[in-house]
Amino acid sequence: MVRVKICGITNLEDALFSVESGADAVGFVFYPKSKRYISPEDARRISVELPPFVFRVGVFVNEEPEKILDVASYVQLNAVQLHGEEPIELCRKIAERILVIKAVGVSNERDMERALNYREFPILLDTKTPEYGGSGKTFDWSLILPYRDRFRYLVLSGGLNPENVRSAIDVVRPFAVDVSSGVEAFPGKKDHDSIKMFIKNAKGL
């Protein structure tokens, strides 16, 4: 069964509802320019209230390794998602201390070729935009198919919502799906009915 990550969590209510609805992971965005930014202090307050089996992921964009690792330890993260132009050497350095998920924006085959450079890590494929995720826009999932089996763990993101997530899973067959804007009432606040329906459709319940 596909795993589900609810990203852009900014409050405990949304985090707990996501978990109770069947989410496997929650994501905190530590990129200050994001509309879904959360401070490490607020993220920690949420993290310590979550059940131990919930995967906690921190999203960073072109951040210094020391800062990433400090925040990861403080918030009690299980993984970090590197969503910028982080070179592979930096990813490897961080991966010595914590699981790294490398995000790659996709709009064409060249982007898929670039993603292959990071295939030693779990890969998150997102729609390529200047905002580094959370755009609400999909990309052409068929671009993934010639490369699909070359990734060990593939996470699909980018414009997913309760209406299209089942089709996306049927086409791509990812290890996990990641959603942020597709289950929001507005940036930073989730719509609980959308979360419930997204997870239900993703997991085929």
Curated annotation (Swiss-Prot):
It holds the Pfam family PRAI. GO terms for biological process: L-tryptophan biosynthetic process. The keyword Zinc-finger does not apply. Gene3D superfamilies: Aldolase class I (3.20.20.70). It is an enzyme of class 5 (isomerase). The keyword Isomerase applies. InterPro entries: Aldolase_TIM, PRAI_dom, RibuloseP-bd_barrel, TrpF_fam. Its EC number is 5.3.1.24. One of its GO terms (molecular function) is phosphoribosylanthranilate isomerase activity. It catalyses: N-(5-phospho-beta-D-ribosyl)anthranilate = 1-(2-carboxyphenylamino)-1-deoxy-D-ribulose 5-phosphate. It comes from the Bacteria. Pathway: Amino-acid biosynthesis; L-tryptophan biosynthesis; L-tryptophan from chorismate: step 3/5. Belongs to the TrpF family. Homodimer. This is N-(5'-phosphoribosyl)anthranilate isomerase. The gene is trpF.
